[in-house]
Amino acid sequence: MPDTLPADPDRFEVSEVNRVRRVHDRGRYDKATIHAFLDAAVVCHIAYTIDGRPYCTPTAFWREGEHLYWHGSSASRAIRNQNKGLPVCVTVTHVDALVMARSGFHHSINYRCVMAFGTAHAITDRAEKLRLMDNFVDRIYPGRSKLIRQPNEQELKATTLMGMEIETASGKIRDKHVADEEEDYAAVPAWSALYPVTQVIGEPSECARQLPGLTRPEGMADFVPGTRLDELMTVTYRKTFGA
């Protein structure tokens, strides 16, 4: 028999890089959970260092398989340096609730988050860049790339698309109610509660220069006012890329 078991393809191997240390039972390493947290988000934060100084850039992103993609201005310092094969850490956080406890120590937040690690690189193939730019639009608005004009040469030149293979990652979640010290429930007369937090889609405000006769495209049918943003992004992701 082999000395070690083969790596589980459905999980990220736990290492010193991705190990969840604080409240480790909240850690998640299975790819299904990590992918779900990523696919429900619109914005990520990309952390990196340039000449020993730390930076963290918020940007829209999306996932295709085990790769993450984002875009930026070709003149951006962040993009220029990421283009050199810079190690990066990509994070996503969803805030699901604010938790009021009977001590400051136990006040908390319900959340879902991901830390993903890899090396950023620029997409240089023109056809691949165009494909990804369409996917960037369709990831949020399914089918929209077929309804709008394609980017012109100046826009292509001004935009850099970055990609990163997820080399390793971990997720973390808190999804419970108030959790106080047992003696505090009876001894501390402080009102305690959990406030759910959600982002929702509102009513659309149409462009004042809309051409006459245009109606909302079929691909926007899921954009119902009051729909949770994270749930909507999961739906639009699956419509564009599948389950």
Question: What does each model-identified segment do?
Answer:
Residues M1-N18, T124, E128-A243:
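C-terminal edge-of-domain segments
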Residues D3-T4, D8, S74-N135:
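Short, structured beta-strand-loop surface elements
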Residues T4-D10, A32-H35, R53-H67, V99-C113, ...:
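Short N-terminal helix-initiation segments at or just after the protein's N-terminus
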Residues V14-Y69, R80:
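An N-terminal domain-cap segment
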Residues V42, E66, K84-V88, R112-A116, ...:
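A generic structural signal for short beta-strands and their flanking turns/coil linkers
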Residues H45-A47, T91, G163-E165:
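A structural signal for short, well-ordered beta-strand segments and their strand-loop junctions
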Residues F61, G118-A120, M162, I166:
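A structural signal for short, well-ordered beta-strand segments
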Residues L68-G72, M162-G163:
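A generic structural motif
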